[in-house]
């Protein structure tokens, strides 16, 4: 008899039950691993699969996470370059792609990443035809459109991480300015994730008190408190972090886990995520931009109708036109 047989007496045959909450992260770079650890520490899945083309890095990351199994409640952590390892995932998070270089705009990255997606997306669909696809790779709005087109999935099952992080940065800086916790500072950044994002100043509030009623010039020129700088800090934030440490990882990883949580726990929380906005706010083209959306079990269930001022809507339409200008040149 083996040590195991001497130690344990078998009572019943374990029935093979598939994972109920399997999450896959594609890409084990800085963002992928920050997303993975954030998902694990929030106990959001019973199985985590990692995929990447760089086999040694992948193997090392999987082993490193497995060595911490004692401290986690996720009993299965797997990884392979073969997409069969991702089979039957509930949520697939795509972080893979060429990394944004210092000073490079997110839009510059496009065609490089489209070519990578042509390999990734069909493989995800093959093994998890019912999954919810979450795109994080930049430029996220265009790549969410690309993933939607390549997957053939209905629009509610393809979500971009969008301005969920931009809005978090906004609320953090607002909190610093007011000496309040970010969760008590309400403000939404919509539109493109990145340089032409739109801060909805009309909706900024604390405890239901609209800050624009207290300071009518908030967000505009001639505001003595220069709140406009808060949005500039949001836009420059990522570039600043990249300049200092070479990449961004922790905040986007936490943002991804926040979105995954709303889906797997069916929370019906509202998040600013990238979705198909054609027909909304004067947008005429087939583009993905961030607007407040309800996330639950089946993905994106509803869109909240924001009351935007004319100039905010104009900025949104301008963003859409910029994105469409790039999209129509892409070879899919």
From Swiss-Prot:
Gene3D superfamilies registered for this protein in UniProt: Lactate dehydrogenase/glycoside hydrolase, family 4, C-terminal, NAD(P)-binding Rossmann-like Domain
Pathway: Fermentation; pyruvate fermentation to lactate; (S)-lactate from pyruvate: step 1/1
GO cellular component: cytoplasm
Signal peptide positions (record): none
Quaternary context: Homotetramer.
Annotated residues for binding of substrate: 106, 138, 169, 248
Family indicated by similarity: Belongs to the LDH/MDH superfamily. LDH family.
Keyword field contains Cytoplasm: yes
Any one GO MF annotation of this record: L-lactate dehydrogenase activity
GO biological process, one term: lactate metabolic process
UniProtKB keywords: Cytoplasm, NAD, Oxidoreductase
Sites where the protein binds NAD(+): 29-57, 99, 138
Biological function: Interconverts simultaneously and stereospecifically pyruvate and lactate with concomitant interconversion of NADH and NAD(+).
Location within or outside the cell: Cytoplasm
Positions of the catalytic residues: 193 (proton acceptor)
EC number: 1.1.1.27
Protein name: L-lactate dehydrogenase A chain
Catalytic reactions of this protein: (S)-lactate + NAD(+) = pyruvate + NADH + H(+)
């Amino acid at each position: 008899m083996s040590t195991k047989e001497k130690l344990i007496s078998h009572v019943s045959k374990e029935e093979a039950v598939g994972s109920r909450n399997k999450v896959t992260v594609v890409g084990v770079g800085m963002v992928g691993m920050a997303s993975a650890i954030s998902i694990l520490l929030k106990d959001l899945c019973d199985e985590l699969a990692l995929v990447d083309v760089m086999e040694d890095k992948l193997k090392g990351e999987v082993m490193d996470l497995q060595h911490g199994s004692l401290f986690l409640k996720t009993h299965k952590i797997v990884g392979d370059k073969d997409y069969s390892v991702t089979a039957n995932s509930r949520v697939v998070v795509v972080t893979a792609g060429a990394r944004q270089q210092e000073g490079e705009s997110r839009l510059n990255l496009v065609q490089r990443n489209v070519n990578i997606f042509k390999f990734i997306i069909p493989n995800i669909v093959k093994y998890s035809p019912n999954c919810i696809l979450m795109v994080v790779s930049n430029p996220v709005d265009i790549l969410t459109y690309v993933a939607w087109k390549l997957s053939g999935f209905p629009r509610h099952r393809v979500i971009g991480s969008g301005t969920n992080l931009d809005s978090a940065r906004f609320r953090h800086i607002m909190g610093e300015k007011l000496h309040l916790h970010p969760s008590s500072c309400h403000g939404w950044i919509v539109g493109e994730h990145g340089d032409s994002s739109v801060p909805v100043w009309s909706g900024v509030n604390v405890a239901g008190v609209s800050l624009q009623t207290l300071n009518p010039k908030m967000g505009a020129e001639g505001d003595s408190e220069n709140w406009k700088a808060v949005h500039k800090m949001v836009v420059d934030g990522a570039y600043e972090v990249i300049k200092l440490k070479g990449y961004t990882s922790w905040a986007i990883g936490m943002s991804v886990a926040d979105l995954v949580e709303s889906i797997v726990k069916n929370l019906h929380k509202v998040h600013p995520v990238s979705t198909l906005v054609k027909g909304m706010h004067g947008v005429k083209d087939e583009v993905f931009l961030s607007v407040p959306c309800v996330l639950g079990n089946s993905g994106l269930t509803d869109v909240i109708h924001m009351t935007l001022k004319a100039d905010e809507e104009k900025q949104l339409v301008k963003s859409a036109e910029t994105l469409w200008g790039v999209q129509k040149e892409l070879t899919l």
